[in-house]
């Protein structure tokens, strides 16, 4: 019996060693410049998932290419578990552009292949689209898997620009970005199939819907979407991508200075994603709560710390309210109110080393200065806020 126990222990140690060696091999297979590494990778038990730096470079490269073409895009980068890692919505983009970027990335991730292949299958046989939809796949080009040294580390999806292949398309934008960031190992694009012609086209008149004058705003131009972008969404008071990225950068640096990490979402005043990022070592709960905080602060028009304090001071009715109306009461969500005008909301999750709300405040102060409204707590010994 003792011999059997020793043999079992020996086999267990051998298996553990094999797992450790396997993890080390995976870690060595993908250069650290592209994936979460070190203690952050040990924390999430994954040495093969895309890091924030790579995701940010891919998004920025795609946006630069789109700007050169005179178009706007939305770009979403996922890790190999399907979590959001980095997201940007260029000014003037709307809901459909944003959500399809996410859908394309998820389709590429699920199939480990370009989302165009799903589109091509549907073009060849339209009866297959229902099955693809039932599987949660989106039959459109613009989603590509992110593969380094034959290891899937994530996926990217781009939406929002009118396709004009072979000159320009969402997929071309994503491919250019991957080639610039990952290198020449990125495979060439799949062939484009011509769309199937409608045998019985209709002749219904299509109305135009264009405002005669661009929307007006009293806010500084640096803070909000302007020009043609504002005209596209009929709103001159949406937070701009540039302002959102400044807020996020300060929050990220502040968290790092506290030896912490965070996940962050910034949404516009319609509740649509503008910018998102997940620092290395963050997991699903951190990411998802950041989104919930931003959405809650937008819906309630107040920081999530208000309900958090109320829950501690007098919980009567709070559970009912939060459940019925899908609110989240942890601190870290703040509506972005500039010169009295709400232009969006921010949500921070994951701790940030010194508190999620504090991280959000640092980003807002650095970006908007005295223009922004921030939560103010009573002095020690004063009446607690209701």
Model-found features: residue ranges?
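Flexible, solvent-exposed loop/hinge segments and secondary-structure transition points
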Residues: 28-386
């Amino acid at each position: 019996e003792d011999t059997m126990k020793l043999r079992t222990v020996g086999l267990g140690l051998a298996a553990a060693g094999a797992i450790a060696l396997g993890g080390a091999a995976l870690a060595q297979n993908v250069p650290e410049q592209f994936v979460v590494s070190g203690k952050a990778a040990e924390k999430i038990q994954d040495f093969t998932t895309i890091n924030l730096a790579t995701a940010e470079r891919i998004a920025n490269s795609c946006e630069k290419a789109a700007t050169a073409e005179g178009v706007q895009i939305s770009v979403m980068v996922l890790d190999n578990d399907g979590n959001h890692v980095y997201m940007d919505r260029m000014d003037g983009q709307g809901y459909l552009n944003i959500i399809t970027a996410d859908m394309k990335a998820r389709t590429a991730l699920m199939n480990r292949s370009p989302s165009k292949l799903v589109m091509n299958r549907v073009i060849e046989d339209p009866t297959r689209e229902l099955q693809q939809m039932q599987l949660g796949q989106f039959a459109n080009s613009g989603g590509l898997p992110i593969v380094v040294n034959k290891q899937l580390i994530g996926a990217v999806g781009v939406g929002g620009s009118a396709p004009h292949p072979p000159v320009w398309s969402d997929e071309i934008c994503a491919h250019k970005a991957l080639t610039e960031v990952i290198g020449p190992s990125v495979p060439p694009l799949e062939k484009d199939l011509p769309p199937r012609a409608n045998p019985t086209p209709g002749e219904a008149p299509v109305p135009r819907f264009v405002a005669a004058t661009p929307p007006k705003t009293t806010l500084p131009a640096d803070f909000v979407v302007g020009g043609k972008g504002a005209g596209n969404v009929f709103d001159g008071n949406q937070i701009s991508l540039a302002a959102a990225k400044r807020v996020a950068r300060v929050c990220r640096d502040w968290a790092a200075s506290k030896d912490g990490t965070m996940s962050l979402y910034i949404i516009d005043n319609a509740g649509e994603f503008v910018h998102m990022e997940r620092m290395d070592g963050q997991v699903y709960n951190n990411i998802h709560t950041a989104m919930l905080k931003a959405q809650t602060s937008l819906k309630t028009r107040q920081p999530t710390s208000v309900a958090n304090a109320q829950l501690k001071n007098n919980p009567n009715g709070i559970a009912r309210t939060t459940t019925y109306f899908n609110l989240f009461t942890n601190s870290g969500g703040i509506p972005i109110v500039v010169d009295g005008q709400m232009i969006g909301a921010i949500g921070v999750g994951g701790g940030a080393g010194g508190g999620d709300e504090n991280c959000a405040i640092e980003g807002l102060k650095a970006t908007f200065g005295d223009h922004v409204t921030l939560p103010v707590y009573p002095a020690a010994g004063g009446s607690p806020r209701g």
